[in-house]
Amino acid sequence: MNAFFKITLVVLSIGHVGCVSAQALAKGLAPQVRVHGLMWDAHEVSVGQVRQFAQQTGFVSQAEKDRGGFIYEAGWTQKMGWTWRAPFGKLAQDNEPAVHLTFDEAQQMCRFQGKRLPKDHEWVKAAYLEQRDQPPTGFQKGQRYTYPNGQSAHKSHCLNGCGNYQGTAPQGALWRGIGHVPVMTTSPGVNGLFDMGGNVWEWVDTGQGSEKMTRGGSWWYDADRQIESDVATKPKDTRVGYIGFRCVQDN
């Protein structure tokens, strides 16, 4: 077990997960919640966590090697300098979700911590089926919800049909949308997890050949992309500004 993993395991009750500061994330500190026998990252992996990983391993992402990741602007457009460090061309804060990372890069970071990317069936069960014995008001054990935030997407972050949040993209940087919000900005949803719906898509370890699935929708899409039946697949070397990830740990 490496030093990075030792400082990332901070277990909180899934009934109450408080705010995590950028300073804590810069040190690799991030909360986990237990859902159906797995320890889940309560939020998407942050820029601060990736920064820790890069400092300890010398990691350089494919987007960095290529001098920039991609965004869709009436066609895929490469953006020079847009990487996990600067997702919209401006240096990110440590508490922003890490994007512009491929499936293999995400899996590599999870495994470095003694974790892994979730399988699709694991992700779906955690996102839509409430499993807490005593969930807070608004959730009921055993109920399957339409959205990861409950019966509506109003407390998540997306293009239309979600909450009123301010994205981190500089004005004029994007052809569409306002970018992601820092992790744990929105309200916790089913099972106490943050941003399983909206903010950024999340890689899951399911797919055939060079294709892998993403789940949950993102800031670039409307709320209807957050529902359980919406299944998206992408080439696993995709590195764009609205796909991130979270890790799980087997008990």
Regions found by a protein language model. Name each.
Residues 2, 6, 11, 15, ...:
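Extended beta-strand/loop cores of jelly-roll/beta-sandwich
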Residues 60, 71, 78-99, 103-232, ...:
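Functional-site microenvironments in short loops/helix caps that host divalent-cation chemistry
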